[in-house]
Amino acid sequence: MRLAFWLYEGTALHGISRITNSMKGVHTVYHAPQGDDYITATYSMLERTPDFPGLSISVVRGRDLAQGVSRLPGTLQQVAHHYSPDLTVIAPSCSTALLQEDLHQLAAHSGVPEEKLLVYALNPFRVSENEAADGLFFELVKRFAVAQEKTPRPSVNLLGFTSLGFHLRANLTSLRRMLQTLGVSVNVVAPWGAGIEDLRKLPAAWLNIAPYREIGETAAGYLGETFGMPAIHEAPIGVEPTLAWLRSVIEKINAVGVEQGVPPIGMPKLNAFSLDGMSAPSGVPWFARTADMESFSNKRAFVFGDATHTVSIVKFLRDELGMKIIGAGTYMHRHADFVRRELEGYLSGELLVTDKFQDVSKVIEDEMPDLVCGTQMERHSCRKLDVPCMVICPPTHIENHLLGYYPFFGFDGADVIADRVYLSCKLGLEKHLIDFFGDAGLEYEDEASPSESAPHASNGHEDVAGGSTAQSVPSHAATEGDGMSWTDEAENMLKKVPFFVRKKVRKNTENFAREQGETTVTADVFRQAKESLGG
C-alpha cells in the first residue's frame, strides 16, 4: 500500500542504476518483468547528459517460467554484442527473488567472459536505493582497485558522486576549484565519469574525499583498510565547514607528503578561492550581519532530508544565519544515529526519523515554521500550507538538475544556499502587499464571487485572501476543519495578516476561542486572541 504514496528512497534498482549509469563502459541488465525499465525515463527526464541510460531489461514472462527457460543468457549475449561493455552488472528484481532463480548459474551459461560480469545479488525487498548504490560501489572498488605507486604530486579521489546526484556537476566544479587553488590535483572522480581503469588506479591518490554519508563512505573505508589511504568524510557546506575542510585537506596531504618527500602545501589567501581571485570568497559573513538578515534571528526553521544535507543545513542556518531550529529529521534510518550525534545541542526535541511524508507534513502543519528545508515532498506539502520551502536534497525534480553553476559545496555553495534561504522567505511579499493595500488595477476584481475567486489561489486551493462576499454567512474556508465559524468582520481582519502566516494565525485564534468557550470567531475574539498571543 505504501507504493500508492510518495517514497523518499527509490528501489534497489534505482540505486544500482545510479552507479552504473554514472560510469563509462558499464551496463546494467535487470532481470525483471516487462515495465520495470521505467527507470530509463527518469534519467532521460532529469539527467542533463547526452548519453542514453546504460540499462537493459531481461524480461521475465509467465510463458517462459512455465517452459522452464530464462531469457537472461540471451539478453547478456545481446548486450555484449551491441554495447561491448567492459562490465555488465546483473541485478535481481523482486520477481526473480520470489522465484529464487540462480543468477550466477544463468550468467555462467551466457557465454560472456566471467571477468566481464558482476552479479549483484542483493535482496530487493530489504535494500533500498542508497544502500544498494553504496554497496555496489563498494563491490566495484573491492574488485578492481589494485595497489600501486602514489602519484608524484598531491592528488585526491572524489568518491560518491553519482548520476542524479543533488547539484552534482556544480558541486564537483566547486571542489575542483578549491583543490586546484591548494595545488592538489584530482586523481579519479568515481563513480561519476569513471571507467574500470579509473577504479584500478584509485590507490594512487594521496587522499580520498567522500563527502556523502549515503554513498561512497563504505568504499572509502575499504580503501583505507586495504591500502592505508586517509579519508575526509565531512561535507564542505557553509563557510566555516569549508574552512575546516580545507585545513583538513592540507593536514592530511602534508602527512602523506612527508612520506613521499614532497614539500608541504599551505593555505593561500582566502581571496584566491573567490571567482574573481580578488574579493572575499563568500558574501555570507557580511550578508548575515545586514539589517535584512538580522531579522532572520527570529525566524523558525524546520529541516528534513538525507543525513548529509540535514546535518549541514541545520548547522548553516543556526551558526551562520542565526535562525532558530525548531526541529529536524531524516528519512535515512541507517544514519539516524550519525545525525543525532552531529546535531547534539542544535535540537530542543527529538530527531524525527521517518520515511512517511505524511508524518513530516503533520509536523510542518503543527509548527508552521517560517522556513522549511526539505525534499520535493516537503515542497508539495508546504505549498498547500503556504509555508516557504527550499529543496536541499533528493528526492528532487527538474529544477534541481540545472545546467548553470549552483553548487552547495564550498564558498560558492554557501552563497547559493544563503540566496535561496533569503528568497524563499522573502519572495511572495508582493502578494501580501496586494492583499493589504489593494490590487491597484492589476487585473484583480474587488467584488469577485466565491466561484470566481477560487481560481486566483496560487496553489489550486481555496485562498482566504481572495475577494470577499457580500453574504453574512461564513465561507467554506471559514468553517474548514472542525466547524469553527468566523464572522465577516473577523475574516476581513484576518486578511490583513500576511498570507505566509495567515493559516498559523487562524489556527492559533481558533484554539484561543475554544479555550474561551466560544463557537464563533468574532472581531472581538480575534482582537483578544491577538493580545493574548502577543500579536
From Swiss-Prot:
Active-site residues, record numbering mapped to chain: 292
Pathway(s) the chain acts in: Porphyrin-containing compound metabolism; bacteriochlorophyll biosynthesis (light-independent)
Key words of the record: 4Fe-4S, ATP-binding, Bacteriochlorophyll biosynthesis, Chlorophyll biosynthesis, Iron, Iron-sulfur, Metal-binding, Nucleotide-binding, Oxidoreductase, Photosynthesis
Annotated positions binding substrate: 428-429
Main EC class the enzyme belongs to: oxidoreductase
Pfam families: Oxidored_nitro, PCP_red
Catalytic activity: chlorophyllide a + oxidized 2[4Fe-4S]-[ferredoxin] + 2 ADP + 2 phosphate = protochlorophyllide a + reduced 2[4Fe-4S]-[ferredoxin] + 2 ATP + 2 H2O
EC number: 1.3.7.7
Tree of life domain: Bacteria
Example of a GO MF term: metal ion binding
A biological-process GO annotation: photosynthesis, dark reaction
Cofactor note: Binds 1 [4Fe-4S] cluster per heterodimer. The cluster is bound at the heterodimer interface by residues from both subunits.
SUPFAM superfamilies in the cross-refs: Helical backbone' metal receptor
Chain residues that bind [4Fe-4S] cluster: 36
Cofactor requirements of the protein: [4Fe-4S] cluster
Region (Disordered): 446-483
Transmembrane segments: none
Family, similarity comment: Belongs to the ChlB/BchB/BchZ family.
Chain's role: Component of the dark-operative protochlorophyllide reductase (DPOR) that uses Mg-ATP and reduced ferredoxin to reduce ring D of protochlorophyllide (Pchlide) to form chlorophyllide a (Chlide). This reaction is light-independent. The NB-protein (BchN-BchB) is the catalytic component of the complex.
NCBIfam families per record: DPOR_BchB, PRK02910.1-3
Assembly mode: Protochlorophyllide reductase is composed of three subunits; BchL, BchN and BchB. Forms a heterotetramer of two BchB and two BchN subunits.
Entry protein name: Light-independent protochlorophyllide reductase subunit B
Organism: Chlorobium limicola (strain DSM 245 / NBRC 103803 / 6330)
Lineage: Bacteria, Pseudomonadati, Chlorobiota, Chlorobiia, Chlorobiales
Gene name tied to this protein: bchB
